[in-house]
């Protein structure tokens, strides 16, 4: 339960519409973080046509860095797309999150600097993410890894991009993701009074991320209203969800996006995919960017590591049986 005092504070902070410049300046304050984690990092790039897509690699150990840039390594990798409503945030702002992710999972983390709306509307941010994923899966980055050891992960708008990249990869057939992790993903297309989801109505005004702000984000991301019907814009619009990766979805109890993420998980499962969905009790949208001392973050990494380790074990058993 949330105290009355905390609820009053949250309500006071949950007001207004999205103003792009001020929202970006506020997000950039994260770069002043005095508790930043210093890991071995490497900046590289992928290409979406003629456009360079910067990526930053985070290595949990010296050994991982040496192995990661040696051809043929099987060190596991998380390909990460950051949140921010497709409008704010950056690789630099998510530096601590990605460093902690590398430490907590013992994975190399590859964070993608996709272009932002409204300067670059749908599908440009998605195509940047897809290009980075394709480069990683086909060993066109400086990092060489086993595609079976890659997991795509994203939070909020990054969860949307993760789901959309996996749909696009299935449809285009250029590479095959085996796992995706969606952290409070934005997979719907409506946050008005017409929304079918209870969480939009219950949590859409008092818990930092509001329904009004979500509508603003969608309006800034879309080219026209028609985009909202596109499954690559709103994965919940996809009617055929077969043949998608093993999926872990984490939602937050006090998040307007909670129900749509859980519904997406159920639809994936009905379509025959292996899916785990966990609701983090007492959590708000955005909690994953908090420090590791927060219990909600610790709980999330227990689910993430359990999902990753179980998937690797199943795949190893399958690979062993296929060689007999």
List the predicted regions and their residue ranges.
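An N-terminal hydrophobic leader/cap segment in hydrolases
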Residues: 1-45
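Alpha/beta-hydrolase superfamily serine-hydrolase fold, recognizing
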Residues: 31, 39-45, 51-324
